[in-house]
């Protein structure tokens, strides 16, 4: 199955880049967090169009969040800049995105605390190369098409680092991830960092192959939910209830995939069969998997190292001036208690 990318999914939205606000109750323009009848604060959450966020939509549309006493409203905001600006302005309480994105924005003063893992890219992203290039170390000196400042560039930097190389060792050609795949297919570059469907297309290319994919690095590109520090401070019981309820949503989804994903077809613009087919490359995490990724405050999970490495990467290319500490940006306690 050719899994749609975040950008491809955005094109399927009715209005690309616009805010499509969906609420369990009526939308409020207030920046406060009103209480529900259970005493929990309303949660205003934003994310882009992506299969890994289906569980959040299912939680709202199925009524499972509401049944848990939660009032969750979500906004689909494709542009990450708009998303974080809304968070900074106080119009949102939480955002779902990747740890590398959280690291960059945290260092720029838009602070969030990651509390819950949603999914991982397990083969949905990768590096394609000429068949003559058989290992990562042979990328040294090669032209590599990659989108500057993107998660794809972060993935490249990470793969190079574990093979004792850096971005300085390759000649980067700045192209979007989709265009990078097309450039490789056309023979204009010997290497490209891209995603599906270009990875599958490369497998059919007699002159190319998938050198490495996120299947070999399943903890690098993941999605998390991060709340503002003030929301966590003022409403810890709401965050705890949200994490617990999300776990129940995923358990329900795994037991009843046809019915559960039926709630997400409009959001994703895909039929249930297509959504289910993407699960091999974008598996939705259970709370158990999320706990393993986060670890505890005493014994950190992999997310801490990923966050730090991402921060180091952004600093190296001049996107941020200092590397943020993961200790204030990650809180595993809600998962521990869920």
Roles of regions detected by a PLM:
Residues 33-174, 190-196, 212, 219:
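Short, glycine-/small- and polar/acidic-enriched structural segments
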Residues 234-316:
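Secondary-structure end/capping motifs
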